[in-house]
Amino acid sequence: MTDDNQNETMPTPQPLPGQVFIRPGIDDRPDYEKTLTPEAKAALKRLAVQQRPRVPEASNERPEVQAARLAEGGSPLTAAAHLDAAVPNLESSFLDLRDPMTAPDGSRPNALQVNRLTAGFALGSLLFAAPIAALDVVLIPQRIDQLVGDGRVAGLALTMALGMVLSFFMNAWIAVGSDHTFGPLGRRTPWIISGALLSAASLAILSVCDLLQLVIVFWLLMQIGYAMIAMPLAAAFGERVPDKFRDRADSWHGMGLALGQLLGILVAVYRTMHPAESGWDGTTRSGIMLFAIWFIVAGIVTLLVLPREGSSTYMPRESVRKGSFFSQYRPPKHAPKFAVAFIARMLAVAATTLIAVYQWYLAAFDLDADGLSGYGLTGAGAVVALMAVAAFVGSLMAVLLLGPIARAFEDARVPAVISCMLFVIGAAAPCMMADKLFGVGLYALIAGFAYAIYDGTSQSLNLATLPDVRSVGRSLAAFSVANTLGSLLGVIAGALAITALAAYLPLFGVAIGFMLLAGVLTMLLK
C-alpha cells in the first residue's frame, strides 16, 4: 500500500432509509437573519415585548436595612438571641427556588468572602459605633462644660437636638443619594470613604474650637459625615449578605455595635484623665482628636476586610422622584395599632436617652464621686465607666435568657410589660438608696437587662401591627422615626427637668414616667 492510498479519504456510506430524522421546526427552521428583509425585521421589533432591566429596590424599602437601623436605636445585643420573630421579607430566596447563597445584589460570595462579609460588617459596626458613643456620653459634654460653665445643660441639649434633627434629614437624603450612585467603586463605598474623611476633618477642627457656636457647627458637619457612613453601610449590609448567612451576620453586627459603644466610652474616659486642663495631655481636646483619627482608621479597616464592592456603572438607572426622600417615612394606612407601638417605642427610647446624654453631668455634679477611684479612673470618669460596663453586662445576661423567656410566654406583651416594670425598679434605685454611686451602677445593670428584654420581646408585637407584609420595609422605615423622636424627646425632657429642679437625680423620675407609659401602651398591643 502506497502513501497516496493511506492518505486517501474513505468514502462515506449512504444513510439507510429512515436513518436521518429531521426534527420539524428545529432542523428545518430557516435562519431569520438571512431570510427576512430589513423591513420585516423592523416590523417584528415593533411587535416584540421590550424587556426592561429591573431597577434595584430602594435601600430604605429593604426590611434587612431597616432592621439594622432599628438595632442602632435599640439594644444591639438582641440580635444575638436568635429570636423566632424575624422581619418578614417577601424578596427572600427561601420563598422561591433561588439559590440562598446568592446575595440580593446578585453576587454569589464564596466561603472566604462570606466570612469576610460577616467580619467586615461586625468590625465596621464596632469601629464606627465607638467614636459616636464616646462623643455623645463623654467628650461633647466635657467640652461644652468647659466652654459655657453653668449653661452646660442648655448648651448640650441644643447641640444634641440639632444633631438629631439634622441626622434625620440627612439619612433620608443620603439613602436616596447612595442608591443613585453609579461608578467603578460601587454605590456604597464612595459614600463611606467621603463620610469618614468628613467626620475626621470636622472633629479635628472641633477639638480646637473655643466657641460653643463653632462647636455646634462642626458637630453638625460630623453628623453629616457619620450619616454618610451609617446609611450606606446599613444598605450594603442588607444587599450583600446572602439569606443563608443573614442570621449569623445579624448576630455579629449586633455584638459589634454593643462592644463598640462600650469600647468608645472606656477609651474616652481613659483618654481624658485631666479634661479641664489646657494642652493635649489627657484632655478633652486630645480625646476628640484621637477619635478624628479613629474615623479614618475605621474606614480603612472596614473596607479592607469587606470584599471589594462591584462596579455599579452597568446597573439600570432611574431618575430621582420628588417624593423619594421622605415617602418611606409615611406611616401605613389602616393600621391603628401602629401608632400605639410607635409611641411606646418612642417613650422607651426617651427613657434611656435622657439619662445617657446627661450621665456625665450627673456623675460630675450630683454624685459624691470625687473620692471614687479604681482601675486607674477617678471621679466622674469612674462612674461613667462603671455604668457602661454594668449596662453591657446586663444586656449580655438578657441575651442569654431572652430566648427561653420569649418561648415561655404565648403572649409577648407579658414579658415586655414585666421588663418595663423592672426598668422602673432599676431607675428608682439611685433615688431611694443612700449610696448613690451603688444606686446608679445598679440602675445601669438592671436597665441594660430590662431594655434588652423589652426590645426583643416587643419586636413581634411591633411586626404584628404592620397591615401589609409586602410593604414591611417601608413600614419599618416609618417605625424607625420613633428612635429619632424618642431621643429628641429624652434630650428636651431631661434639660427641662434639670433646669426646673436644679438637680440631675430627677432624671430618673422622668425616665420612670416614660417607661410606665410605654408599658401601658404595650398592653394595648395584640
Give residue ranges: language-model regions.
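Cytoplasmic membrane-interface "Motif A"-like loop-to-helix N-cap segments
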Residues: H180-G195, R407-M421
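Helix-loop boundary and gating motifs at the non-cytosolic
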Residues: P15-M164, A339-A344, A348-S373
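A membrane-interface helix-boundary motif in multi-pass transporters
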Residues: R187-T189, T272-I293, L496-M515
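Glycine-rich segments within core transmembrane alpha-helices of 12-TM secondary carriers
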Residues: S167, R248-T272, S480-V491
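Helix-to-loop junctions at the C-terminal end of transmembrane segments
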Residues: M170-L185, M397-D411
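C-terminal ends and interior cores of transmembrane alpha-helices
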Residues: I193-D210, M421-D435
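A late C-terminal transmembrane helix in Major Facilitator Superfamily
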Residues: V469-A500
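Multi-pass alpha-helical transporter architecture, strongest
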Residues: V297-L306, G509-K526
